[in-house]
Structures are given as structure tokens and as C-alpha cells.
């Protein structure tokens, strides 16, 4: 009976760990939950809520911004950040490239190298005539602690504590192989933690729009 209860407990732990999805974070806050809860968390970070525009305002990464909490089925799936003030073509190019460099040099992110705009690029012409879109996409790395918790929970469904403590080469090889397999399983079953930004043109002026997305909560067309 004790053994049965132990197995049930380990399976429950495994399911619970797996249910804790590794989602995109904004300022350390998971992009998830209800809109009202997210607004309160952002207010605690120093942002001010404007009930007229239904947006928050404040400073983010050295710039004055406006933030919108976007939901699907009452769950937050996106944090939308817009520069509060526009700027000219030269300044927006510098701002865009600076953001690219910041993401590239941030150990929490991965993405294609050199998504910057060249110095001789005519942004206004390309956007107006060729409808070119300037954007850069990066991905937050998976949470190592959550990966480890998932792997350990899965191992406990297959091995006893005594087996995991076995230091024999044969057992260690088996455990190492399973750790690798469970690690890949975690990666395959967790969606990308996407953070991207783009240049928005507004009658000759420009601003950066940035998006922190939780793909788990996005609409997948099942309501069609």
C-alpha cells in the first residue's frame, strides 16, 4: 500500500511540474494570468495605470513607454510596449540597432545575429514605397530550474530513490541517457518564449513597438 501511494505521489508531482509551463516573462513577471492581476503587478513595478486609455505608463529600459495588457479568453497572452514619444528617422534607426545589441548581449536571450539596420538604409522610402517591415525577434532561454525539476520528476516515475543513488556505471549511464531524453522532451513540448519589436511609422515620425508573447494563451483558431 505504501509503495502504491508513493507511486501515485510521484506521478502527481510529475504532472504538476509539467503543468507549470515555462512562459515568457516581462520584468520577471510571467506573461500569464488575469489582466487585473497583471496590471497590479506592473503597478507594483512603478508603472501608473491610465483608466482612460486602459494602458500603463512609465519608464522601461531608459525610455518613456505605454504598456497594454492583451488577453485571450481572459488570460494574458501579450504585453505590448510602445514608445510614448515618436522620433525622426535617424534616431529610430539608432534606437532599433541599440535594442538589437542589447538583446544580443543579454545572456537570457538567443536569436539570429545582426538583425540591425545598415547605416545607408533609407527607412522612410522602404516603408512607404516597398512596404518593408523592420523587426527583430529574440527568444528567452528556457528556465534551467524548471527543466531540472521536470527531469527529476520524470526520473522518479521510472526509478526508485535507491536506484537513482546507485553509483554503478551501468545505472549512471541509464540515468544520464534518460535525463537527455527528458530534457529534449521538455524542449519539444514548450513553446517559444518570444520577444520581438518593430518600427512603426506615423506620418514621417517613428516609434518602437515591442511585444512579449505567451504563445500558450494565444488564440489557436479553435473557436472558428
Residue ranges and their predicted role:
Residues 4-17:
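Sec-dependent N-terminal signal peptides
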Residues 9, 58, 125-128:
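Short acidic-hydrophobic surface loop/beta-edge motif
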Residues 20-49, 85-224:
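Non-cytosolic coordination micro-motifs
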Residues 42-82:
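N-terminal, post-signal-peptide region of Sec/Tat-exported proteins
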Amino acid at each position: 500500500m505504501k509503495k502504491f501511494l508513493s507511486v501515485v505521489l510521484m506521478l502527481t508531482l510529475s504532472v504538476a511540474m509539467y503543468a507549470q509551463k515555462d512562459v515568457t516573462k516581462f520584468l520577471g513577471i510571467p506573461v500569464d494570468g488575469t489582466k487585473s492581476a497583471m496590471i497590479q503587478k506592473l503597478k507594483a513595478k512603478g508603472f501608473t495605470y491610465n483608466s482612460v486609455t486602459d494602458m500603463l505608463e512609465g519608464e522601461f529600459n531608459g525610455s518613456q513607454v505605454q504598456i497594454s495588457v492583451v488577453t485571450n479568453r481572459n488570460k494574458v497572452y501579450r504585453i505590448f510596449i510602445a514608445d510614448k514619444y515618436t522620433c525622426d528617422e535617424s534616431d529610430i534607426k539608432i534606437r532599433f540597432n541599440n535594442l538589437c545589441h542589447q538583446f544580443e548581449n543579454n545572456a537570457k536571450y538567443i536569436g539570429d545575429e545582426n538583425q540591425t539596420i545598415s547605416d545607408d538604409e533609407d527607412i522612410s522610402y522602404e516603408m512607404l514605397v516597398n512596404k518593408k517591415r523592420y523587426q527583430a525577434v529574440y527568444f528567452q532561454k528556457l528556465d534551467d530550474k524548471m527543466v531540472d525539476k521536470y527531469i527529476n520528476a520524470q526520473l522518479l516515475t521510472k526509478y526508485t530513490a535507491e536506484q537513482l543513488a546507485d553509483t554503478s556505471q551501468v545505472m549512471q549511464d541509464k540515468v544520464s541517457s534518460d535525463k537527455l531524453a527528458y530534457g529534449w522532451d521538455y524542449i519539444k513540448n514548450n513553446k517559444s518564449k518570444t520577444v520581438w519589436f518593430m518600427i512603426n511609422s506615423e506620418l514621417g515620425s517613428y516609434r518602437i513597438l515591442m511585444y512579449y508573447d505567451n504563445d500558450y494563451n494565444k488564440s489557436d483558431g479553435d473557436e472558428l
